[in-house]
């Protein structure tokens, strides 16, 4: 049986962490691509030398040539300018559209059948741009956002309630930004809803509201602390979870920025937006779940924000 090939476009902090996790989980051979001369090759050599220690036997190589994307089963895109202190994800729009054009054309010409995961910000717009330039079908391209945002939500809830994070199931929908929608109605601790915990006095409403707010600004909090970069351990872990579900046909239902068809969640057009999504060997399948009226209103705000950025992206492309 042929080994799978995972290509990571962007060999920075997230790309390097993705590569290490892919090796540890024995998902397949790894290619690290970056435009920086020598950097992906150096990281690949370093990672290759972990294999005897980790007890794994896979190939890792670095490259500056898009031809090396050929026959990739999975491509995870992190290439682009990262956030800096005081910078919103949306500030990155113009710069990273150009990056997505170059990367998209590289995918189109070398691995059009690959399963593509986009991590570059602003996420919901970049995955749209990446599809535009790559031509990858709706079911084979997805954005990583909700898995990360939900993990942050779960972490903050577990810390507040002093319980195992494994006991906390919490979900975030909508765009990957300030308008994201943490679903307090669906989320629970060992089967007990957050609403019930509030009623019982085990979780104060003001603390829940603060956790929701902190989740929305979770990425910015890390950027402010690091000062010279943005999060990479958790984003990489989220991307690998999605890739593993595809490669192993696990059919996990994860919150992701999938191409949601008009009619679902009140959409009047097809749109990449974060919703519960099944990821299998066939690709992605958005799922519609019941949400409260308040959450639906919040989701609409998030949808409108994504549409506005898509319009801004279209204007940039038209220049």
Swiss-Prot record:
Q: What is its EC number?
A: 1.1.1.37
- Any GO BP: tricarboxylic acid cycle
Positions of the catalytic residues: 176 (proton acceptor)
Which UniProt keywords are given for this protein, alphabetically ordered? Answer: NAD, Oxidoreductase, Tricarboxylic acid cycle
First-tier enzyme category under EC = oxidoreductase
Q: Name one GO molecular function term.
A: L-malate dehydrogenase (NAD+) activity
Protein residues bound to substrate: 83, 89, 121, 152
> Transcription regulation as a keyword?
no
Q: Which reaction does it catalyse?
A: (S)-malate + NAD(+) = oxaloacetate + NADH + H(+)
Q: Which positions bind NAD(+)?
A: 10-15, 34, 96, 119-121
**What family does the Swiss-Prot or TrEMBL record give for this protein?**
Belongs to the LDH/MDH superfamily. MDH type 3 family.
What this protein is reported to do is described as: Catalyzes the reversible oxidation of malate to oxaloacetate.
Protein name per its UniProtKB record: Malate dehydrogenase
Organism in which the protein naturally occurs: Francisella tularensis subsp. tularensis (strain WY96-3418)
Give the gene name.
mdh
């Amino acid at each position: 049986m042929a080994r799978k090939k995972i290509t990571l476009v962007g060999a920075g902090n997230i790309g390097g962490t993705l590569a290490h996790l892919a090796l540890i989980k024995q998902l397949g051979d790894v290619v690290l691509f970056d435009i920086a001369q020598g950097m992906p090759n150096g990281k690949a050599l370093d990672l290759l030398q972990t294999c005897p220690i980790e007890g794994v036997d896979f190939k890792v190589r670095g490259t500056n040539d898009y031809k090396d994307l050929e026959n990739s089963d999975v491509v995870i895109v992190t290439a682009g300018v990262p956030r800096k202190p005081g910078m919103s994800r949306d500030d990155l729009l113009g710069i990273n559209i150009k990056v997505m054009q170059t990367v998209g054309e590289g995918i189109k010409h070398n691995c059009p059948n690959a399963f593509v995961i986009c991590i570059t910000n602003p996420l919901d717009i970049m995955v749209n741009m990446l599809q535009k330039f790559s031509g990858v079908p709706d079911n084979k391209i997805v954005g990583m956002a909700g898995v990360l945002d939900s993990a942050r939500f779960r972490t903050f809830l577990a810390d507040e309630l002093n319980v195992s994070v494994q006991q906390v199931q919490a979900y975030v929908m909508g765009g990957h930004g300030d308008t994201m929608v943490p679903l307090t109605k669906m989320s629970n601790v060992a089967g007990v809803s957050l609403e019930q915990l509030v009623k019982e006095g085990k979780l104060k409403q003001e603390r829940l509201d603060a956790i929701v707010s902190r989740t929305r600004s979770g990425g910015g909090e890390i950027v402010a602390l690091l000062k010279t970069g943005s999060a990479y351990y958790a984003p990489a872990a989220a991307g690998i979870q999605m890739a593993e579900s595809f490669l192993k046909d696990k059919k996990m239902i994860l919150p992701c920025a999938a191409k949601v068809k008009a009619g679902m969640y009140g959409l009047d057009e097809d749109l990449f937006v974060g919703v519960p999504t099944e990821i299998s060997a066939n690709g992605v399948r958005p799922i519609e779940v019941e949400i409260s009226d308040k959450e639906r209103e919040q989701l609409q705000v998030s949808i409108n924000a994504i549409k506005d950025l898509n319009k801004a992206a279209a204007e940039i492309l038209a220049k």
